[in-house]
A protein has these predicted regions:
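Transmembrane alpha-helical segments that form core, pore/gating elements
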Residues: 1, 52-53, 85-141
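Hydrophobic alpha-helical transmembrane segments of multi-pass membrane transport proteins
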Residues: 16-35, 80, 97-109, 137-167
């Protein structure tokens, strides 16, 4: 699937733009989770539709009323699911919002590249660049990765790989 019409040069630009954004997204998401809780960190990350809507508006695309309605309903549900009393750190909230903003930038910017080059190719290039950026941290925890190889493969293949094939 990747080899068909595969030109590495055309993937450099999306990789260099989206890869660092993906690395920022990952680091800030996990930092938010560490400073607060999984529920608060993931809840903040899932505020990204609001930022996608805002970015699209800034690009001149007027949101449809049903989109605003559905996102509003989603945020009301998110409010009820989040346990506000678990918010321990304003810094964690900041990291969660940065994670959501970087994810929304990946979606908005990546849409153009994906329509031209294909989503799988773009995902490959951004994952490659993000992996290179974060390799130092992976190297420092290589013993954990080796001890937990099955978990690492599951997280890498199923959660990341399968998730990205839908995008």
């Amino acid at each position: 699937m990747i080899r068909k019409n595969f030109n590495i040069k055309e993937l450099i630009k999306p990789g260099l733009i989206l890869g660092p954004l993906l690395a920022i997204h990952w680091v800030t998401m996990f930092e938010s989770i560490e400073l607060n809780s999984i529920a608060v960190g993931i809840g903040l990350v899932f505020s990204y539709p609001l930022f996608v809507l805002l970015l699209e508006f800034l690009r001149g695309n007027k949101p449809k009323s049903y989109q605003v309605f559905l996102i509003s309903i989603g945020f009301i549900g998110l409010y009820f699911l989040l346990d506000i009393s678990n918010i321990n750190s304003l810094e964690g909230i900041f990291y969660g919002l940065i994670s959501a903003i970087s994810l929304s930038l990946i979606i908005v910017i990546g849409e153009k590249f994906s329509s031209q080059l294909g989503g799988l190719k773009v995902a490959f290039s951004q994952l490659l660049v993000a992996s290179i950026i974060l390799i130092k941290f992976t190297y420092e925890s290589r013993e954990w990765l080796i001890d937990n190889l099955a978990v690492s493969i599951f997280l890498g293949f199923f959660l990341t790989g399968v998730g990205l094939t839908t995008y």
